[in-house]
Amino acid sequence: MQRAVLHCIVKGPAHTRIDKTARMREPMTDNDSGTFPSQPYWETKKLAEMSREEWEALCDGCGKCCLHKLQDEDDDFVYYTSVACRLLDCETCQCKDYPNRTVHVPDCVQLSRENVDTLNWMPSTCAYRLLSEGKGLPDWHPLVTGNRESTFMAGMSVRGMVISEDDAHPDLTRYIVKWPA
């Protein structure tokens, strides 16, 4: 039996988890007549049309994008590991230095409107990925629930389930997980 060769492909972008949910869910008039939009912005706007604040609020704080991933050379399958970027606070799922993350972790991928469609390794539950694929947000998403803890409460966060790369064995295959990705 031949063993698959896996390579670390990405550590992923680390997003700050600023609680803007309440403000994002407040009704805002969308025209001079003072009428209120009938649908939330993520259901009416394309990713490219969103403001920076709206874009950042899409992050559900799961931390999965900040995990080391391995890609099989033979079939390109991406495996998630339980090893997090050294900047991810494993208990809060927040980046320890979001504004300067690419200085500390040069291969940290910055998710953007330009590259969101090309990053097929993003978690299947990621709001950016879901919206780029024309899908809606899951019921547990903080923008839907109005509660930043809903990702964790739904079991969709890596909070408390991962270790820092600083504490991991160099053989990342030891840490491959089968969580929902």
Regions picked out by a protein language model, each given a short descriptive name:
Residues 25, 29-61, 70-181:
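Short loop/turn segments that flank or connect secondary-structure elements
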Residues 2-3, 27:
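Cationic, low-complexity basic patches in intrinsically disordered or flexible, solvent-exposed regions
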Residues 3-5, 13:
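N-terminal leader/targeting segments
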